[in-house]
């Protein structure tokens, strides 16, 4: 085996507008609170049960943070891909505390808006870099906000026209 994998994928809704701040270095950081929900039927009572889990997401990628600031609002449905990290901090009494966060680093991670902002009902995908070619804008308009490389027009050989007829 080649090592280990630390990858978190979430599809959920923002519980609040993104919190945008700047580090001492001047880098922009976005903090998101994302809710994921699951529902099931209780076998004994037949009653429908729901459970919501809240996730803290930190975006260190400046381009993705700008996208979050500009386009994301409370209630927006998003796809997030990042890594799980534990952050150690101290409370007011000096006690050590730990928080689990999904982190999108400068050149890793992905943010995809799943809500429609156009008539076509398609979402937009913004990548944080890496060595994958990926479609940065499914709707055909707008820019490649999260691209870190010089991939201006090509999408790894795939056509951007998603309405092509399937030959079978």
Swiss-Prot record:
A motif (Important for interaction with partner proteins) lies at residues 163-168. The keyword DNA damage applies. This is Single-stranded DNA-binding protein. GO terms for molecular function: single-stranded DNA binding. Residues 54-60 bind DNA. Pfam families: SSB. Residues 147-159 have a biased composition (Low complexity). It comes from the Bacteria. The lineage of its organism: Bacteria, Pseudomonadati, Pseudomonadota, Alphaproteobacteria, Hyphomicrobiales. Residues 5-111 form the SSB domain. Plays an important role in DNA replication, recombination and repair. Binds to ssDNA and to an array of partner proteins to recruit them to their sites of action during DNA metabolism. Disulfide bonds: none annotated. Residues 113-168 are annotated as: Disordered. The keyword Secreted does not apply. Keywords: DNA damage, DNA recombination, DNA repair, DNA replication, DNA-binding. One of its GO terms (biological process) is DNA recombination. Homotetramer. One of its GO terms (cellular component) is nucleoid.
